[in-house]
Amino acid sequence: MIEFILNGQPVRVTEVPEDAPLLWVVREHLKLSGTKFGCGLGLCGACTVHINGEAARSCITPLSVVARQSVTTIEGLDPQHAHPLQRAWIAEQVPQCGYCQSGQIMQAAALLKKVPKPSDAQIVEAMDGNLCRCGTYQRIKIAIHRAAKEAA
């Protein structure tokens, strides 16, 4: 049995191996489908969540790592879907297929928590490894700048 906080609520996971990927626990056992499976190797960023406020790849994070920790998924970033990044994503028309967006937003949220007004270089560095098969990287960067201004 593993207990942790998920999106602000206590969760107890039983009958799941401790080495099961957090991604599968969140999606299959806890029925939160916003976090996506991309590569399964932690290389694409589609599965990004926050563990204690830090961006982490949930596809390679064993469930045991989050015992007594706080995990936030895209569903918990803002229950009203009104986080500055979510609004900026819409305003800047970032999504095309949308598959990578939850991971992109979660990675960007971790960046803005550390660096409230990031430079282009800081954005590029922080977002490196979050892949977008549609190539909307420029719009992602613009949306992050927009969210930073809005949050200030």
From Swiss-Prot:
UniProt-listed Pfam families: Fer2, Fer2_2
Signal sequence annotation: none
Protein EC: 1.3.99.16
GO molecular function, one term: metal ion binding
SUPFAM superfamilies: 2Fe-2S ferredoxin-like, CO dehydrogenase ISP C-domain like
InterPro entries the record matches: 2Fe-2S-bd (IPR002888), 2Fe-2S-bd_dom_sf (IPR036884), 2Fe-2S_ferredoxin-like_sf (IPR036010), 2Fe-2S_ferredoxin-type (IPR001041), 2Fe2S_fd_BS (IPR006058), Beta-grasp_dom_sf (IPR012675), Diverse_Oxidoreductases (IPR051452)
Keywords noted in UniProt: 2Fe-2S, Iron, Iron-sulfur, Metal-binding, Oxidoreductase
Task of the protein: Specific towards N-containing N-heterocyclic substrates, including isoquinoline, isoquinolin-5-ol, phthalazine and quinazoline.
Protein name: Isoquinoline 1-oxidoreductase subunit alpha
Gene: iorA
